[in-house]
Amino acid sequence: MNALTVIPYAEFGIQSNFSFLRGASKPEELVVAAKLMGFSAIGLADRNTVAGVVRAWQQAKVEKLAYHPGCRLVFGDGTPDILAYPRNRAGWGHLCRMLTQANLRDETEKGATLLQRDDLLEWGDLMSLAVLPDLAAGAEDSLALLGQIKDRFGRALRLGVSPCYAGYDRFRIEQAAALAQVAGIPLMATNDVLYHTAERRPLQDVLTAIRLNTPVAEVGLELSANAERHLKPPLEMARLFRRHPQALAETLRFAEELTFSLSDLQYNYPDEPTESGLGPQAELERLAREGAARRYPSGVPHSVIKRIEEELALIERLNYARYFLTVYDIVKYARSQDILCQGRGSAANSIVCFCIGITEVGPDRIDTLFERFISEERNEPPDIDVDFEHEKRETVIQYIYEKYSSKRTALAAAVISYRGRSALREVSKAMGLSEDVRASLSGSIWGWSTSEVGEKEARAGGLDRSDPTSRHVMERANEIMGFPRHLSQHVGGFVITKDRLDEIVPIVKTAMDERKMVEWDKDDLDAVKILKVDVLALGMLTCLQRAFILLTDHYPKARDPYGQPYVLASLPPEDKRVYDMIGRADTLGVFQIESRAQMSMLPRLKPKDFYDLVIEVAIVRPGPIQGDMVHPYLRRRQGKEKPEYQKPELEAILSKTLGVPLFQEQAMKIAIVAGGFRPGEADELRRAMATFKRTGTIGNYRQRMIDGMVGKGYTKDFAERCFKQIEGFGEYGFPESHAASFALLVYASCWFKTFYPDVFCAAILNSQPMGFYQPAQLVRDARDHGVDIREVDVNCSAWDCTLEKVPFDPARILPRHADMRGVIETNHAVRLGFRQIKGLSKERMEDFAKRRGSGYETVRDVWLRSGLDVDEIERLAQADAFRSIGLDRRAALWEVRALGAKSAAEKLPLFDQPALRLRELEPETKLPKMPLGEHVIHDYRSLGLSLKAHPVAFLRERLDRAGVTPNANLPSQRDGRRVSVAGLVLVRQRPGKGNAIFLTLEDDKAVANVIFWERTFTRFRPIVMGARFVKVSGKLQSESGVIHIVAEKIEDLTPWLTVLLEKVSGAGAPGPQPMGYAKEVGSDRRSRPEIGNAPARQDLATLSEEAEQVMPKGRNFQ
């Protein structure tokens, strides 16, 4: 044979990186390599999973390579591994049922599969099987096994054998051949592949070490002895099996038996009885027409009627009516339970979705493109996303399970992959690096970064790239980036079927017993055309629903024109005062436009109407930024540049965005009108944008579009610039329909913040966790707007934050918000709820409030009547919640620690009475007053905020001496001046792959916005990423009301926070230990301190560390 000889051969049993922490190549890499090597066919077979088969199938279609999905069955009862490949659609159903049965056993842990031989015997029909026997075991046992399986499955069985490259392969293969001959089954060759190229062997070693949680140097015999488990060309396989050529030929016969393809999967939609008894299509038409009449009470416009008819006709041709009715049923149920919800995403392009109440933005408010939602050419199921209140979504989920049963519904999977930080952390651990080095390395990476780990990160983490171990760590970390770690449940994507779901895809357990998920993620499901309904959780919907309830309960005059309480759809639209507030970037806490990047854009864009909000939501995204769309749009909006339209057809598409394509729908329309794409092809372009990071296929359309535009008379330069902008959508381009759905919530949240900041503050605190900012900043912002915020108190607070009637004093509004005087209509204070105290449960505290009656009088009264344990009462004392009883934090803790049992129920009244009388005779203990700084520290520890003082206020004199400009004074500084600012780090944000990092710093009066350009960030990376309190020096930039400090230097001032404890070091008066310096909550505090003895003090270093750690760490966003 010469090098050009083509040897027919099919490789089966290939394991990809979806054999988690075993396979060292992606499915796509294996397919491409197999095509290049000239394989006749291949078959993926990951360990007890089919999670990677769709990705391999998609790549095989591109490469035009015969591909067969299968699974490597790994048993828990000693049965040797068996390769299982379905021969037809029914066989695929059997494989899925077998894996599901093993996945869902009671004794099976999440993420594991407990497969038994009986599962194979029950479900192994209609599959071709290859047993991989342990040739080191006795021949008698192997023959018994082969005989049992052959008796059950007959000619479907083979004996698979692979070389082990340990010096005795000839004997090994001869042994297998003899065993096959005696058993009467064919011998089949395989290389038991784990990676596509030998260069991946080092990565496979690292994966083994991670899986075994043992450094590579200590794994020993668990590592492969060589690098031979890679795809080998058929010619090489022929050489290895030259004494048994029939073993290679058998791979082809094995492949010929396999007629099943993933394209054979046919999804069947749920088919439930309709409300009216009509068929699905007729029912949908009825609902659409009735809904249109409600949406347009003055008469349905002819254009709307026409669009409804066109959409309904297409829905009928594609047989999608049952899908729409399924989503309608879920939304209808949610609203029957007073759960706020709305559809978003591409569904907002549909007038039918609007009419039947799935979406809330009408087509008159945006330029819709129905092909973005449904395409006859594409003939793929539509995707409707519906957001629900995040605290009530579980109610909707349980309804879905109850109605459709666990056999017909499950959540989609989410593939949790290695990103920069996790890749570095795991690989460095596998390579035996010390804990401090690992922490330094992972701390040098942006939290969710998927960018390659390079020289800058290595230097920041203290690695020397010239050191072989360090270089190995970086190389393996980059290789593992994007590899799957495990499957998790999707945030809310449900697959619902008419027939059994577990005959389409295996079902597995999740961390929640009542939930199950399939093995495929949303992209896999899209590829095989399986319907998914996204039941998503959105914190702002919870906030708005709570705000509407508070508004109705406390502001009876706040009503719509018909005298009804406001709801989302009836809020007064286009109120100038709301847009004025937005234009000033006074948007902390509101939906979507609260980030520093958004706030810096608002004064420049100055939204005036709803469509401006749609643009605002979409423009501060990596897509428009990467596509160089932001600055041209702003220049044109500000009149500094005229829009450019080469032809009227483009003006019709781009006029609303001043000639700049900001939305995916516009990109599709340009491809259709100017590039000559068909609608279905334009949607393929849109999909290429959406999956750019995973597939990188958007470049395939470049020449096609440029040639199409040039052919229609556009200049090549313009066509190239146009495609470059569209290519930017590969980094999270936003659909206009999606932005419009979000803009509705932006306006609603801003409306509440404008007129009722008390309502907004209480509602958003009661909806935590959500958003960019922590409760401390939300409370501070409300106080800046004149809202009275009151402390948590045992006699006044409920679980949630509540409103208390109080006259509103506009003078409380800070000068920088002076424009809100005369606008804000609030007349209530916000009482902080028990939910703000860390470590308390809702159920216990709601019961505590019910037992309160006319009020608790003493700590002992709380103990006797409330039902709380001493530990819970102590948490109340730590939060300084006994002020209405006349006790501050220290006094309340003294009283709590005098209680004699964990709970009052443990102490019989007969024995309790003497203690009561004895206590009455005890002398009053005079406790030293707790310093204010110490109070603030403990407020932050217990509540995450303090109403007593801001931590930076204690440092103001020292900061003034250091030349630091208070943040509130920045607006009076001239543009270009060098200044220094300081504050607690609230937020770090790095939009997309931009070369700027935004920091938000808070001092005692205001916030400052800081920009670090990449070079400066690299220089000071550890401080930027890790410090809690910093000083930044740089040049002030002021434009259109937007003020930034362009950083030149940053200093870590976190140790300065110890000033809050300065009085502690000199305290010597007798009394109990300051709160928080005793043992942690839950430890034994039953013994009462001796009166008059001074408490032991921890050293100042420990106290300093505590002062630093209790301050907020800052949140990182991309």
Swiss-Prot record:
Keywords: Cytoplasm, DNA damage, DNA repair, DNA replication, DNA-directed DNA polymerase, Nucleotidyltransferase, Transferase. GO terms for cellular component: cytoplasm. It is found in: Cytoplasm. The keyword DNA damage applies. It catalyses: DNA(n) + a 2'-deoxyribonucleoside 5'-triphosphate = DNA(n+1) + diphosphate. It holds the Pfam family DNA_pol3_alpha. One of its GO terms (biological process) is DNA repair. NCBIfam families: polc (TIGR00594), PRK05672.1 (NF004225). HAMAP family: DNApol_error_prone. It is an enzyme of class 2 (transferase). Its EC number is 2.7.7.7. DNA polymerase involved in damage-induced mutagenesis and translesion synthesis (TLS). It is not the major replicative DNA polymerase. This is Error-prone DNA polymerase. One of its GO terms (molecular function) is 3'-5' exonuclease activity. Belongs to the DNA polymerase type-C family. DnaE2 subfamily. It comes from Mesorhizobium japonicum (strain LMG 29417 / CECT 9101 / MAFF 303099) (Mesorhizobium loti (strain MAFF 303099)). Transmembrane segments: none annotated. Residues 1071-1118 are annotated as: Disordered.
